[in-house]
Every structure is written in structure tokens, then in C-alpha cells.
Amino acid sequence: MQTIMITGCSSGFGLETARYFLEQGWKVIATMRAPQEGVLPASDRLRLVRLDVTSAQSIAEAIAEVGEIDVLVNNAGVGMLNALEGTPREAIANLFATNTLGTIAMTQAVIPGSERAEAGPSLILPRRSPCNRCPCWLSTPRVRRR
């Protein structure tokens, strides 16, 4: 059975992605900053895991808890609809820490496991939109080797 770890499953795309893969028979590790029972259908193939992608300690604890995975979906993210000139610097820093640095940190965290295990993650997906492009250097041969 394939195992998929999805960050940012409390709502939106992450929540719907977790639902989809549960319906397809996958083992789903749904991560959230504050896991909430009941947001996803109960299943013996579902694990809710606490994860804040802006915290190195939280990432390390989550990776240690979940073990081997087949797919990582870097979905955790925050949005902002404010005009740049009216947006506090702290809000921009939080957006960058979550959407960019969090994606990089999660990818870095799963690469060692994929190098040790023959069946390590075969696919690592960044969250993408026309306004939130993932730097092309995240698609390295090490990450895309399968």
C-alpha cells in the first residue's frame, strides 16, 4: 500500500487531496499545525500528525513519527490578498517562511530517508500556482530520481 504525506490538510487543497487519496486506498498521513479529528473520514489508513513547516523541531518530530513515505505533497501554505504597500513586514516574513522555506525544509527532511531506503519517496510535489512558482532548483536529480 502506498503512503502519501500531505502538509497543510486542515482545509482547502490539502484537505481535498487527503480525501482523494483515502478514497483511492492509499495510506494517508495528513499534517496540520493543530490536528482536528473529524475533518477527514475515520479510517485505519489515516494518520493525523502535528506539523508546523516553519519549525525545524516540528519537522524533525513529524518525520521521525511517520517513518517511510512514498510521496510527499508540500501543500502547507498561507495566502495574502493585501496590496504590498499595506502589508506588514511580519506578514510577508510569515508567508515566505511557510510557503518557500517550509517547502524547502520538508524536502530536505525527506531526502535522507529516500537515500537510505530503496523505496524512499518516489515523488516530492511542491505547491504551485501561477503566483507561487517553486524555484527550479528544487527539482534536482536527487529529488526526481525515480
Predicted ranges, named:
Residues S10, A18:
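N-terminal Rossmann NAD(P)H-binding glycine-rich loop of SDR-like oxidoreductase domains
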Residues S43-A56:
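Rossmann-fold cofactor-recognition segment
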Residues T54-G67:
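Conserved Rossmann-fold cofactor-binding substructure of NAD(P)-dependent oxidoreductases
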Residues A76-M80:
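Conserved NAD(P)H cofactor-binding loop of Rossmann-fold oxidoreductase domains
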Residues A83-L84, A91-N94:
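Substrate-binding pocket helix/loop in short-chain dehydrogenase/reductase
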Residues T107-Q108:
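A short, exposed helix-loop element centered on a Lys and neighboring polar residues
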Residues L123-R146:
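Catalytic loop of short-chain dehydrogenase/reductase
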